[in-house]
């Protein structure tokens, strides 16, 4: 489905741009002064910001009901890890039901990498997408949660961290950016400021230490810290003080952007199986959903 979507986006004239391309900072001190960014595309081309949430390879993606942390016959066929191969390229680890291990383009990142290699003009200045990460189940399929240090031992645990850092560095070099999605997925609308702050500080400790700091926040659970009015209040002040300047909520509109001097908020359209099957018209300006929906979906 994703390969079909990418091909249609390309054929329809879309070009990947970074979320940060939407702004330029004209400040002369530490405080931002955002203005609309300048994006220069060939005639007929249209900018597209792409992102993926839950780019963690959480346990449910790689395990069946037996909790052995291995793919099996009752699993759902997800890739289980993002790696850097011996050639310095990103690759996905995929385990067949019979235990056979494969490496290749089996997930969002590696499929997009493959597509841009074949169609370099699909990317503006090398931009790929933004990956939103949580931290409570590790990063990129590695056991980077501190609780694993006791079970694995210090040396093996640090090797997991080192490999995850290598993946992060390779992603950055290849035009990817990272967004926080909270240490664990909480509703930013329903949780109080202190709870959210504690959650975000855990993200800094356990995820930023691997992927680096970020100024992008992709809200989990289709939540937000405010309505369509300009941001204000304790939650915004807390997140701003933690360094966040780009905020992404969800919406079904073709585009929705709120640019202020000190932040940018952009709505995201969620592309998943339910939306492709039940709301195909939401994507009509991007691609024809019925043409890419896999009939093998339950």
Where are the model-predicted features located?
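Metal-dependent polysaccharide deacetylase catalytic core of the NodB/CE4 family, i.e.
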Residues: 28-35, 41-48, 56-225, 253
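Short, glycine/charge-rich beta-strand/loop segments that flank catalytic centers
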Residues: 21-29
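C-terminal active-site subregion of NodB/CE4 polysaccharide deacetylases
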Residues: 1-22, 34-50, 61-62, 173, ...
């Amino acid at each position: 489905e994703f390969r079909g979507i990418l091909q249609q986006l390309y054929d329809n004239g879309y070009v990947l741009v970074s979320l940060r391309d939407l702004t330029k900072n004209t400040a002369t001190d530490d405080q931002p002064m955002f203005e609309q960014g300048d994006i220069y595309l060939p005639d007929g081309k249209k900018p597209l910001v792409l992102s993926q949430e839950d780019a963690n390879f959480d346990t449910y993606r790689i395990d069946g009901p037996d909790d052995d942390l291995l793919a099996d016959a009752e699993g759902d066929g997800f890739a289980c890890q993002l790696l850097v191969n011996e050639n310095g390229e990103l690759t996905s680890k995929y385990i067949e039901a019979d235990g056979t291990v494969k490496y290749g383009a089996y997930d969002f990142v590696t499929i997009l990498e493959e597509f841009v290699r074949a169609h370099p003009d699909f990317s503006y200045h090398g931009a790929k997408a933004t990956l939103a990460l949580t931290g409570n189940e590790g990063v990129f399929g590695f056991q980077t949660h501190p609780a694993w240090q006791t079970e694995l031992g210090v040396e093996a645990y640090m090797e997991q961290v080192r490999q995850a850092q290598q993946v992060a560095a390779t992603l950055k070099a290849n035009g990817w950016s990272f967004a926080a999605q909270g240490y664990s997925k909480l509703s930013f609308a329903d949780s109080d400021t202190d709870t959210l702050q504690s959650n975000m500080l855990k993200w800094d400790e356990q995820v930023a230490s691997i992927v680096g700091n970020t100024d992008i926040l992709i809200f989990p659970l289709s939540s937000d810290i405010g309505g369509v009015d300009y941001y204000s209040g304790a939650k915004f002040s807390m997140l701003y003080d933690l360094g966040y300047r780009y905020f992404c909520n969800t919406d079904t509109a073709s585009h929705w952007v709120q640019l202020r001097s000190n932040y940018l908020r952009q709505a995201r359209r969620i592309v998943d199986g339910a939306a492709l099957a039940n709301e195909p018209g939401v994507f009509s300006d991007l691609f024809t959903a019925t043409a890419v929906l896999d009939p093998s979906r339950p």
